[in-house]
A protein has these predicted regions:
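Active-site beta-to-alpha loop of glycosyltransferases that engages the nucleotide-sugar donor
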Residues: 1-6, 21
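Short acidic/polar active-site loop segments enriched in Thr and Asp
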Residues: 13-14, 70, 102
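Active-site-proximal specificity loops/subdomain of glycosyltransferases
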Residues: 25-72, 82-85
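Charge-dense, extended regions
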Residues: 319-323, 327-331
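Short beta-strand/loop segment that forms part of the nucleotide-sugar
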Residues: 13-21, 42-46
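Catalytic-site signature of metal-activated, phosphate-bearing donor transferases
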Residues: 83-308, 331
Length: 332
């Protein structure tokens, strides 16, 4: 609810939302919002060998909403576009970019759990207000980005972090800029497998992507139970928590967008049935946590993460050494 309201307030006009076998009431909430004309909701069931996220991305590329769009943002519901430009609208951001921009690499900003143990029915952006600093190059997750792309750019498929590009020999390279509107180097534009901004410009003075991948310890247990939509082989475990639980600095920059978000959120809650469905979903999460935390494996994980302190930002020198050792360790 908050995620939709936030991006509606920022100027997103159309939402194409894929849900994946939800049992927490999310599907019913999305159906109610779709019936009211707020979003398009497409429940999906996994078919074939692709991950369910890639299945959705390939389907979305063929959807009429994608075909009529001017700009496109692929985003998970734990990612909030944080626009720093005065006005805090996507239209304000676009005006601040070079005219020939095809894509914006929006750097992730990892937000920690802010020492919040139990889930609350309160805005994510108001609860979790501590993050990694802008300069944070380790672990690799701190250097990832999401892409705001011009629909008419030289692309032929959506991607989790960046779109697939048409052959450069036929369409040329897309004009990429960072979150400050500065042109990205050609090596970045040419290598569409590059998903990290490590050692590359990662400006964020115009916009960035707040990533609330942990939230409370309670919510994290439910995330562990569900798994990731694109990498079922990746464990949601203590390592995942430590690599993302940065509470290094107070970061409330997104609060400038909250008044407009709250207006939209109130409007969404006035849609018949939505508030009741939301309340049921909140109760489901609390009940699910209680069922999980009394199981040995989940209890062990919960106990460890509440004992674990915030993650430390490594020095540039140590980060570089770790990268060199990584190259040696995984050299084929």
């Amino acid at each position: 609810m908050e995620w939709i309201a936030h991006h509606q307030a920022a100027g997103v006009t159309d939402f194409l939302i894929y849900s994946n076998d939800c049992d927490d009431g999310t599907g019913e909430i999305l159906d109610a919002l779709a019936a009211a004309g707020e979003i398009v909701h497409l429940p999906q069931t996994k078919t074939g060998s692709q991950s369910i996220q890639w299945q959705a991305l390939r389907d979305a590329w063929k959807h009429p909403l994608r075909k009529k769009a001017d700009w496109i943002l692929v985003s998970d519901v734990d990612e909030f576009l944080n626009i720093h430009v005065a006005g805090h609208q996507i239209s304000d951001l676009l005006k601040a970019l070079p005219d020939d921009t095809d894509a914006v690499a929006l750097p992730w900003r990892l937000f920690g759990n802010n020492d919040i143990v139990f889930a609350k029915d309160a805005p994510v952006t108001a609860q979790f207000t501590t993050s990694a600093p802008a300069e944070c190059s380790s672990p690799i997750a701190a250097t990832l980005f999401k892409s705001l792309i011009r629909a008419g750019g030289p692309f032929n498929q959506l991607g989790v972090h960046r779109p697939k590009q048409k052959p450069a020999t036929k369409a040329g390279l897309p004009k990429w800029v960072d979150g400050s509107g500065n042109q990205m180097p050609g090596v970045f534009a040419a290598n569409q497998k590059r998903l990290s901004l490590y050692s590359l410009p990662s400006g964020r003075s115009l916009a960035e992507m707040n990533h609330y991948s942990l939230r409370s310890a309670e919510s994290f247990l439910i995330k562990r139970d569900r798994g990731l939509p694109n990498r079922k082989d990746k464990e949601i475990d203590l390592t995942y928590w430590v690599e993302r639980n940065f509470n290094t600095e107070r970061n409330e920059t997104i609060s400038a967008m909250r008044p407009a978000t709250e207006k939209r959120l109130s409007a969404l809650h006035r849609i018949p049935g939505v508030s009741d469905l939301h309340g049921r979903s909140v109760n489901w999460h609390h009940e699910k946590f209680r069922a999980l935390v009394t199981q040995p494996d989940f209890h062990r994980l919960f106990s460890r993460i509440v004992l674990t302190g915030s993650s430390k930002v490594l020095s540039k020198q140590l980060t570089q050494q770790l990268v060199r050792w990584y190259g040696e360790a995984y050299r084929s």
